[in-house]
Amino acid sequence: MNITNKFQHTPIQGQPQSNLQAQQILLSQLHQGQAQQQQQQQQQQQQQQQSSAGVLGSGFQPSDNFGESLNQNIYQNNYQRAQPSLQQQFFPQFQQSQQQPSQQANNASQLQQPYQPAQQMVRQTSHFQQQQQQQPSSQQFYSQQQASVLQQQQQQQIQLQSAHQQQSSLLNMNSINVDNPNSVYWQHQQQLCQISRGSNVPHYYARQYASNSRKAKNPYSEVKSVGLVEATRSMVASLEDEEEKKKKPINYQGTPTTSAALLHNKKSTQDIFEDDSMEEQRMRLKTQGKQLWCQLDLSGQGLVNISSKLFHYDFLESLYLSNNKLNSIPSSISKLRNLRTLDLSHNRINELPEELGLCFNLRYLFLFDNNIKTLPYSFGNMIELLFIGIEGNPLEPSIANLIAEKGTKELIATLRDQTTVKRTPKPRCWLTLEDDGEVVDSDEVYKVEPESSDNFTVLSYNTLCQHYATPKMYKFTPSWALQWDYRKNLLEKEVLNYNTDIVCMQEVETKTFQEFWLPVMTANGYKGYFFSKTRSKTMSETDSKKVDGCATFFKNDKFSLIHKQNFEYNSVCMGSDKYKKTKDLFNRFMNKDNIALISYLQHKESGEKIAVVNTHLHWDPAFNDVKALQVGILLEELQGIIKKYRHTNSNEDIKNSSIVVCGDFNSVKDSAVYQLFSTGASKGHEDMNGRDYGKFTEDGFHHPFKLKSAYEAVGELPFTNLTPAFTDNIDYIWYSTPTLQVKGLLGGVDEEYTSHSIGFPDANFPSDHVPILAKFQLKKGKKNHSV
């Protein structure tokens, strides 16, 4: 193509010389830039087609990369600007009339190109003189062109903004407006919500798991895809690392702090299982390998309701119900106590059941894009919850702002502390026993009966020392219900209302005994003694008063004290040659500072002498052998005390002695401790496997007493210790069957109340243990009046 020949023409009369020079300059530029012009025209035509089809078209459809292109267009100013071409700037006579709307549309297409096509330029040049007479002056026309260009730019911006708003409305449905949207917690909410919205295919989690499993088997495969749960776990871990760095104290080598010394040999946390692999391993061990799966993906199935049979699968650890049409969640979801991950996102849920708060093992709860307006206070029980996804819900601003400012853990703590005393348990019923031991069913409440010459009552109660009642240990308890002032008032009221003849308490602080319990009990006709744990001997006077121990009280008008003896298990063992000093004895037994308090009392009405033992054994289930050895030593030493104060060496007299052993034994029914008490012997029990304690493991444990649990008639209580990590019966009152008979028992805690609770203490129960109470009758003809 010869540009010079095509565009040459004769000078036009009356045309200014400056315009002719400008034409020559333009022709020279066109001649030099022909190749670039054609390339630019092709690129611009493609951009116009994409723009008209993708953004400016009437049928806008959002795409996956729309946000990226939109950011480039709006924020980087890369979209096409409508600018006058060189000919329009310097040759106003080349323009057609701008008055008709159809011609304006054509001009808009032309204005987006830097140069006009050459053929059009020739045609306009040939009619230059005629159009010069019809067009207004150059300055006036250029002003009109600028106005037209500005109008078109505004229209483009309006269309782009409309498209951006449409895309934003699709990606940010019901977005919550919080006061601080730039906080790291809220950024995580939005990021994870976007990931969740992208997981809208049926069985999303199952597909992802299968895909990642295939990639894991192929060493050359691409990197595994990161799903919602993995992304959440990563974000939570990074936050915890940052918080840990801020809180990390300086680690000084040397003597432990006072708090560390007080908590020696005491469990200091109620954490369930912090590692996912440990939890899965525990589940497999619990089911003995019979349960091979623990996750269920029902996402994207269009479910409207959930069958109640689903909640019989109490082994489930992950349940995915996202992208369905659920309007509500059944309250029976509380049966899934092992759940760690629950996804209810993208449904139509209006309200969450309070029972969901009983799923205290939950760590990740996703509720994105529902119609939830508030969260129940029972969510304060979710002590393991690390993240709750609430973006896309019309949630109360106070809750949303709390999550945005302080995160999920602070939300749970706030809901927990805002819990009020809404529910009160029914009084514990009183169980009456006939002479043959049969329990009489009754709804009667325990009442203090008139004194009888041959009856007495015994209460055993672990009152929870205030130094152990920490927010870290009892994360599920409202902070106000954990305060000692609140708890001690409940404890005092409870103990005095039962008004038993003998009271055995465990975990009583030394200072609390001296300044609180002793004055209170003395004022109500009791006399009491106290013995603290061994560690108090190695501490200063101030710190030693914070150590806990056992306290025994008895009514002055019912009993008189013959003798009392403090009992340290490790000291007794080391001070006697009859206990073999083995490796296990030193490494496992000697560093436990548990104690017992033995009171030898005489019943004033009958003259019967009764040995009352109050003890608290070691807590750790990994040391069940130590507990069995402690009980073996206790019963062996008790024989010596009875022989001494009954002035007898007869085994028959020892068997017929009146004995009551109370305490927190930290042992369940199938333990070696229970076996030793109830049968009189324990040999070859699994608790002692692989241990060497001399004669206790070679010959087994033996004692001559005939002891029985007071609650054996009812098969023991469902529990005496209730926490999220452990719920079972570990407190007992043992009695000698030849001389004593059980006539009444304090029943269990209201089942309806405990079904809505994950652990004690709470607003109504001041300790993690519940008291046990038994009424005994001295058997006729078995009384021994000798002193």
UniProtKB/Swiss-Prot annotation:
GO cellular component assignments: CCR4-NOT core complex; Cdc73/Paf1 complex; P-body
Top-level taxonomic group: Eukaryota
Compositional bias (Low complexity): 37-54
Binding site for Mg(2+): E507
Cofactor: Mg(2+)
Reactions performed catalytically: Exonucleolytic cleavage of poly(A) to 5'-AMP
Record carries keyword Repeat: yes
Biological processes per GO annotation: cellular response to starvation; DNA replication; DNA replication checkpoint signaling; filamentous growth; filamentous growth of a population of unicellular organisms in response to biotic stimulus; filamentous growth of a population of unicellular organisms in response to starvation; fungal-type cell wall biogenesis; nuclear-transcribed mRNA poly(A) tail shortening
Subcellular location field: Cytoplasm; Nucleus
Ranges: LRR repeats: 291-313, 315-336, 338-359, 361-382, 384-406
PROSITE patterns: LRR (PS51450)
GO molecular function: 3'-5'-RNA exonuclease activity; metal ion binding; poly(A)-specific ribonuclease activity; RNA binding
Keywords, ordered alphabetically: Cytoplasm, Exonuclease, Hydrolase, Leucine-rich repeat, Magnesium, Metal-binding, Nuclease, Nucleus, Repeat, RNA-binding, Transcription, Transcription regulation
Region (Disordered): 37-70, 92-137
Pfam families found in the cross-reference section: Exo_endo_phos, LRR_1, LRR_8
Purpose: Acts as a catalytic component of the CCR4-NOT core complex, which in the nucleus seems to be a general transcription factor, and in the cytoplasm the major mRNA deadenylase involved in mRNA turnover. Ccr4 has 3'-5' RNase activity with a strong preference for polyadenylated substrates and also low exonuclease activity towards single-stranded DNA.
Protein name, per record: CCR4-Not complex 3'-5'-exoribonuclease subunit Ccr4
Protein source organism: Candida albicans (strain SC5314 / ATCC MYA-2876) (Yeast)
Gene field: CCR4
